[in-house]
């Protein structure tokens, strides 16, 4: 994938960049793997706003992704590499030998016509899925399960990857993209390789309207609100915060305040905390 630049024909185009979509092989998704996706605009079942900055955007359909990779021993051929509006990574359509079709996250280097496998007999090749106990130390992986059989939950975004660092009893040490080193059960599955579309982070949206096409609404500063809307609101002119530290709209400390639950049950699985930004 390469980044496409535009001539500054308008102010919105001046710094705008996009993907050239060179890896995409079709624009028509597999109909049997599509599901309707209703827009919620950040509202819950009572119609109350629970997530800010959501609303509008282009109409989408959900692509059913196989995060479990449990078609053991059945070869699958990569039919297409496709764009997915619901995630930063591209997806690959897999045609299995028994006739079933599934979408998976497209790994970097995965090509149309390539054959992939799942299970203990699979080779250590890009796109193959195995249990962590069967993956050699030093291997780069993605789409990692946290509970056996639940499906991949970690390392699914464009360009991300994790590395197998070692094995200790029934656990495997994994270094995640953030730098955190974590113990994960050896019977959990992961897919070999790095997630593709790695230049996604270099894309410059360029103008506010393009954010709106993606369903993102504006973020308003608390300092320009009224005091009944935000702890930073009110005052005459450009007033200071008036508190010891910045606050969230709900009165909780923010910008550096630790929100992780103390004595979290999963603390025992974290060997080293993530890198500080």
UniProtKB/Swiss-Prot annotation:
GO terms of biological process kind: cytoplasmic translation
Top-level taxonomic group: Bacteria
Pfam family, one: Ribosomal_L2_C
PROSITE patterns named among the record's database cross-references: RIBOSOMAL_L2
Record-level GO cellular component terms: large ribosomal subunit
Matching InterPro entries: NA-bd_OB-fold, Rib_uL2_dom2, Ribosomal_uL2, Ribosomal_uL2_bac/org-type, Ribosomal_uL2_C, Ribosomal_uL2_CS, Ribosomal_uL2_dom3, Ribosomal_uL2_RNA-bd_dom
GO molecular-function term, one example from the UniProt record: transferase activity
Annotated segments matching region Disordered: 24-55, 221-277
Gene3D superfamilies: 2.30.30.30, Nucleic acid-binding proteins, Ribosomal protein L2, domain 3
Family from the record: Belongs to the universal ribosomal protein uL2 family.
Subunit structure: Part of the 50S ribosomal subunit. Forms a bridge to the 30S subunit in the 70S ribosome.
PANTHER family: LARGE RIBOSOMAL SUBUNIT PROTEIN UL2M, RIBOSOMAL PROTEIN L2
NCBIfam families recorded: rplB_bact
Function: One of the primary rRNA binding proteins. Required for association of the 30S and 50S subunits to form the 70S ribosome, for tRNA binding and peptide bond formation. It has been suggested to have peptidyltransferase activity; this is somewhat controversial. Makes several contacts with the 16S rRNA in the 70S ribosome.
Protein known as: Large ribosomal subunit protein uL2
């Amino acid at each position: 994938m390469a980044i496409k630049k535009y001539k500054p024909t308008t102010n919105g185009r001046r710094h705008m960049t996009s993907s050239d979509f060179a890896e995409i092989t079709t624009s028509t998704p597999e109909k049997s793997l599509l599901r309707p996706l209703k827009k919620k605009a950040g509202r819950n079942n009572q119609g109350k706003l629970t997530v800010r900055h959501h609303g509008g955007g282009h109409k989408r359909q959900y692509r059913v992704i196989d995060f479990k990779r449990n078609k053991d021993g059945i070869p699958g051929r990569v039919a297409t590499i496709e764009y997915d509006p619901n995630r930063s990574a591209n997806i690959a359509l897999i045609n299995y030998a028994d006739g079933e079709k599934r979408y998976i996250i497209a790994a970097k280097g995965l090509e149309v016509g390539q054959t992939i496998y799942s299970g203990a007999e699979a080779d250590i090749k890009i796109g193959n899925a195995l249990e962590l106990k069967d993956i050699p130390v030093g291997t780069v992986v993605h789409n990692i399960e946290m509970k056996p059989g639940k499906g991949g939950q970690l390392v699914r975004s464009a360009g991300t990857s994790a590395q197998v660092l070692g094995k200790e009893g029934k656990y495997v040490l994994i270094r995640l993209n953030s730098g955190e080193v974590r113990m994960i059960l050896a019977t959990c599955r992961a897919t070999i390789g790095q997630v593709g579309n790695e230049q996604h982070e270099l894309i410059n949206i360029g103008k506010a309207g393009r954010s709106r096409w993606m369903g993102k609404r504006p973020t308003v500063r608390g300092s320009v609100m009224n005091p009944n809307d935000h702890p930073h609101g009110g005052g005459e002119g450009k007033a200071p915060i008036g508190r010891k530290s910045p606050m969230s709209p709900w009165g909780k400390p923010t910008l550096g305040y630790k929100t992780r639950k103390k004595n979290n049950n999963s603390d025992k699985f974290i060997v080293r905390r993530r890198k500080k930004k």
